[in-house]
Design a protein with these regions (language model features):
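Short, conserved sequence motifs used for protein processing/export or organelle targeting and
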Residues: 15, 22-237
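Typically the conserved alpha-helix immediately C-terminal to a functionally engaged Cys/Sec
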Residues: 4-21
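Short active-site neighborhood of thiol/selenol oxidoreductases, capturing the structured segment around
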Residues: 1-4, 191
Length: 238
């Protein structure tokens, strides 16, 4: 909330999502000195070698620098498009969630076309949070924060899912505790699935087909899905 340049990056990513017809899901990770501190931020900041805020990351493959909105949104779209072209999706996600008291329950069906070792991460996000934000050096007490990470329902490193055969369906259930100060009507669950790069067309350990490669580990995001709490998302492959 203290970061004056963060709204500009956020707007650029919203634009990128719109350009991709909603196939790009967003999550806003706040640091320890924000009003919306999230416990998992440091884990991902370390993985992606974040030196300062704001920093954008797309598909766990490449970081995006903050710039003019049109430049930044184009960079995000380019990386996401490159992921889809270079690494065709091999998983599909169907999910549902319910809130019982302060317990969030998430049921997941993971459709897997290709045997591999995957990692599944489940986060609880909140939209429409009105509060303070430094907006380009101007104090804005009515700024609307969206896609704010509230709870890591799994480890931030993801739950390991071993799939030994092609064309399998893996069923998983997760749960976590929700704070009473969070608005259930504005909550949604974000699920993303990471897959190892493998040895596809690599030269000296780097995929020769791609431009945007940050060497942030052995996996990239193969697919993701966001659904409002209390709703069901049917299988979607994209």
């Amino acid at each position: 909330t203290w970061c004056g340049y963060c709204p500009m990056l956020g707007s650029a990513f919203e634009s990128a999502k719109s350009q991709m017809n909603g196939s790009l899901e967003l999550v806003s990770l706040h640091g320890s000195d924000s009003n919306y501190e999230f416990s998992g931020t440091n884990t991902l900041a370390s993985r992606f070698r974040v030196q300062g805020f704001p920093t954008g990351v797309v598909d766990a493959r490449a970081t995006i620098n903050n710039d003019d909105q049109s430049v930044t949104s184009k960079a995000a779209v380019d990386v996401a498009t490159e992921t889809a072209d270079s690494y065709p999706v091999t998983t599909g996600i169907a999910c549902s969630s319910t809130l019982s008291g302060n317990t969030i329950n998430v049921d997941l069906d993971l459709y897997v076309k290709e045997a591999d070792t995957y990692r599944v991460t489940v986060l609880l996000l909140e939209d429409n949070i009105t509060g303070y934000q430094n907006n380009g050096g101007r104090s804005d007490n009515n700024y609307v924060h969206n896609d704010v990470a509230r709870l890591a329902i799994t480890s931030m490193n993801g739950e390991r899912v071993e799939v030994s055969e092609d064309y399998q369906v893996v069923k998983k259930s997760f749960s976590g505790t929700v704070k009473s100060s969070w608005d259930p009507d504005n909550m949604k669950v974000l699920i993303y699935v990471e897959k190892p790069y493998g040895d596809r067309d690599k030269v000296d350990g780097v995929d020769s087909r791609v431009v945007n490669y940050g060497n942030y580990g052995d996996t990239y995001i193969d697919n993701c899905r966001a659904v409002k709490v209390g709703e069901t998302a049917d299988l979607e492959l994209k």
